[in-house]
Amino acid sequence: MASISVDSNESIDKALRRFNKAVQADGILTEARRREHYEKPSVKRKRKEAARLRKLQKMAREANN
């Protein structure tokens, strides 16, 4: 769980920005979006395989440069 401590002289906007960065770093929103609807195991496997292939292609492109 993301948490921050707000100083007495810190603006709310600055604290909110820090909180949003912490939430993004923890991956809370992406996890919530992923769990919003049930995902069948076959769909989950396909999604993971597609992500793995994208990662391999990206690594291959970077290795060629």
From Swiss-Prot:
Region named Disordered: 33-65
The UniProt record lists the keyword Ribosomal protein: yes
One GO term describing the cellular component: ribosome
Assigned keywords, A-Z: Ribonucleoprotein, Ribosomal protein
UniProt keyword annotation of Ribosomal protein present: yes
One GO MF term attached to the UniProt entry: structural constituent of ribosome
Top-rank taxon: Bacteria
InterPro entries found in the cross-reference section: Ribosomal_bS21, Ribosomal_bS21_sf
Compositional bias per record (Basic and acidic residues), positions renumbered to this chain: 33-42
Regions of compositional bias (Basic residues) in chain numbering: 43-58
GO biological process, any: translation
Family as reported in the entry's similarity comment: Belongs to the bacterial ribosomal protein bS21 family.
Protein name: Small ribosomal subunit protein bS21
Gene symbol of the encoding locus: rpsU
